[in-house]
From Swiss-Prot:
PANTHER family: D-SERINE DEHYDRATASE, THREONINE DEHYDRATASE, MITOCHONDRIAL-RELATED
Name the record gives this protein: D-serine dehydratase
Entry annotated with the keyword Lyase: yes
Catalysed reactions listed for this entry: D-serine = pyruvate + NH4(+)
Protein's gene: dsdA
Subunit record text: Monomer.
MF terms (GO), sorted A to Z: D-serine ammonia-lyase activity; hydro-lyase activity; pyridoxal phosphate binding
BP terms from Gene Ontology: D-serine catabolic process
NCBIfam families registered for this protein in UniProt: D_Ser_am_lyase, PRK02991.1
Membership in a protein family: Belongs to the serine/threonine dehydratase family. DsdA subfamily.
């Protein structure tokens, strides 16, 4: 307890985190892209290479997953305006939201119905390509739909994949790995929803369940993989490959905005609100957005009050050297995808200069907004996916933040607020009804 008091003396906001208060922290260390980029350790070339790799796999994906065929084997989600929800939020919170609110529906991505369809699937494909190229079975000029042949399935069946997950990452990696022919084991934390485990098992995936939280599931997955040279462990806490799979979203969004005639520049700022668990998904997406829109995009991470691992790590500068449990927080939240007690040290250090801020919200707030979105827009998400929905009113309410960045009322009036909906498209009907019943 004495250590917590010392921490609070240096970092006063920790007191609010410990008290489980909804907290907003605007990052005083936020810099320009030019200043912040070198610290990421990855470049635009790396993201372009990821983009190209996904293009090589497009013919394969189009055949393996017919739901991607219309998009030519591209796994991408819609961006939709949510004007009725914007009005509802203004009414509920008594706060005008300047500009226009949009929803990025990663909740409805093909294959696994969450943002993890970006990073998880990309890393599995990257590993499969590497093995096939090294074995001389494939060249990068080939039509990758040959990977669907029995010979390739046979080849990949010698190899296995392991991952630790609270649910959605396991879903994307499990489904993709099983499709390619890998043996796959998903180490699931106590937070993982039963339907996600059942879905994985229906794809022939081995699911190992733990009574502990996410950190333990990842650690056990890592250990299990170490003993088997043919087993590849996908490391959600440190993976650069996952990060790049998410980062591709930046250029894709830029293209979607161009199609819609939506301008993002100094006079028309873009604010993006990303739910954050361990940090790989939001970190990678934010990195891609920064490369695509430069200093005209402002990224915020959103976390449950019971799992504020990234806010705690970045705010104190301790990153993965501190967990929410260290300050007496239980890491128990209805936002199962965000139930992470210790943030990725890689993501925190890579992105701490490129984030405008982080905030927390209560589980009940997520349930309330889940209900409002279903009522107003007919869009149903899982609780985690609503974390970003609390962002616009926090930004619009903070005169200090607006002044620090020199935003005029005109600029704010021209702003786009993009809420990144991270999951929920595959939630079973009865489960969704339970979520809806919890909203006020």
């Amino acid at each position: 307890m004495e250590n917590i008091q010392k921490l609070i003396a240096r970092y006063p906001l920790v007191e609010d985190l410990v008290a489980l208060k909804e907290t907003t922290w605007f990052n005083p260390g936020a810099t320009s892209l030019a200043q912040g980029l070198p610290y990421v350790g990855l470049t635009e070339q790396d993201v372009n290479a990821a983009h190209d790799r996904l293009a090589r796999f497009a013919p394969y994906l189009a055949k393996a997953f017919p739901q991607t065929a219309a998009a030519g084997g591209m796994i991408e989600s819609d961006v939709v305006a949510i004007p009725a929800m914007q009005k509802r939020l203004e009414k509920e919170y008594g706060q005008t939201i300047n500009g226009e609110m949009l929803l990025k529906k990663d909740s409805h991505l093909a294959i696994s119905g969450s943002i993890k369809a970006r990073g998880g699937i990309y890393e599995v494909l990257t590993h499969a390509e590497k093995l096939a190229l090294e074995a001389g079975l494939l060249t990068t000029d080939d039509d990758y739909s040959v990977l669907l042949s029995p010979e390739f399935k046979q080849f990949f069946s010698q190899y296995s994949i392991a991952v630790g997950s609270t649910g959605n990452l396991g879903l994307s990696i499990g489904i993709m790995s099983a499709c390619i022919g890998f043996k796959v084991t998903v180490h699931m934390s106590a937070d993982a929803r039963a339907w996600k485990k059942a879905k994985l098992r229906s794809h022939g995936v081995t699911v190992v369940e733990y009574e502990d939280d996410y950190g333990v599931a990842v650690e056990q997955g890592r250990k299990a993989a170490q003993s088997d040279p043919n087993c590849f462990f996908i490391d959600d806490e440190n993976s650069r490959t996952l990060f790049l799979g998410y980062a591709v979203a930046g250029q894709r969004l830029k293209a979607q905005f161009a199609q819609q005639g939506r301008v993002v520049d100094a006079s028309h700022p873009l604010f993006v609100y990303l739910p954050c668990g361990v940090g790989g998904g939001p970190g990678g997406v934010a990195f891609g957005l920064k490369l695509a829109f430069g200093d005209n995009v402002h990224c915020f991470f959103a976390e449950p009050t019971h799992s504020p691992c990234m806010l705690l790590g970045v705010y104190t500068g301790l990153h993965d050297a501190i967990s929410v449990q260290d300050i007496g927080i239980d890491n128990l939240t209805a936002a199962d995808g965000l139930a992470v007690g210790r943030a990725s040290g890689f993501v925190g250090r890579a992105m701490e200069r490129l984030l405008d801020g982080l905030y927390t919200l209560d589980d009940q707030t997520m349930y309330d907004m889940l209900g409002w979105l279903a009522q107003e827009e007919g869009i149903r998400l899982e609780p985690s996916a609503l974390a970003g929905m609390a962002g616009p009113q926090r930004i619009c309410a903070s005169v200090a933040y607006q002044q620090r960045h020199g935003f005029s009322q005109t600029q704010l009036g021209n702003a786009t607020h993009l809420v990144w909906a991270t999951g929920g498209g595959m939630v079973p009907e009865d489960e969704m009804e339970q979520y809806l019943a919890k909203g006020r």
